[in-house]
Design a protein with these regions (language model features):
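Conserved Asp/Asn-Gly motif in the active-site loop of CheY-like receiver
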Residues: 37-44
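CheY-like receiver
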Residues: 48-130
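N-terminal glycine-/serine-/threonine-rich beta1-alpha1-beta2 phosphate-ribose binding loop
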Residues: 6, 15, 33-36, 55
Length: 161
């Protein structure tokens, strides 16, 4: 079965969005992943869509985009999502330290080096898999079975199911 990854590309330049999209497709094909790509022209556009369906695994994010910059958008996103892997892709080196504040996976400079980009996407998948395993362990460890008088009850924390 082919693993699916949902990638959001947020960049105000159509040429950059198209280029990133094609690189993601190549990377996905090389790794036998099914890639679902959504493109956004602004931070506001992304956040509006994200409010409806919070289902992205990887976010490729430009810094300079107009009214709201990428770092501000990442701060807003991190208020309720710490699992999406944020990768800043920009031509501005002066925002690198801001990437650490929002727990960005990486900060890539334009023009992109294809192999470096693919390596960073591989790291994003590794972190997603690790996060998924941690969530599964937490879910299983919260459940316990109790067998009083040959009657089974499934409990989650203090709540009987």
């Amino acid at each position: 079965m082919c693993q699916t990854y949902r990638i959001a590309i947020c960049d105000d330049l159509a040429t950059d969005r198209n280029y990133l999209s094609s690189l993601c497709e190549i990377w996905g094909s090389h790794n036998s992943y099914h890639i679902q790509i959504s493109e956004f022209t602004s931070a506001e556009n992304f956040l509006f869509n994200y409010a409806e369906k919070k289902d992205f695994d990887i976010l490729l994010l430009d810094i300079e985009m107009g009214a709201m910059d990428g770092v501000t958008m990442a701060r807003k996103l991190r208020q309720d999502n710490h699992t999406v892997q944020i990768i800043f892709i920009t031509g501005y080196a002066d925002y690198i330290s801001d990437g650490y504040e929002v727990d960005a996976l990486h900060y890539l400079m334009k023009p992109l080096q294809e192999e470096k980009f693919f390596t960073v996407l591989d790291r994003a998948v590794t972190k997603l898999i690790k996060n998924e395993k941690v969530l599964n362990i937490i879910s299983v460890s919260e459940m316990r079975f109790v067998c009083p008088s040959a009657r089974l009850r499934l409990c989650r924390g203090k709540q009987q199911l």
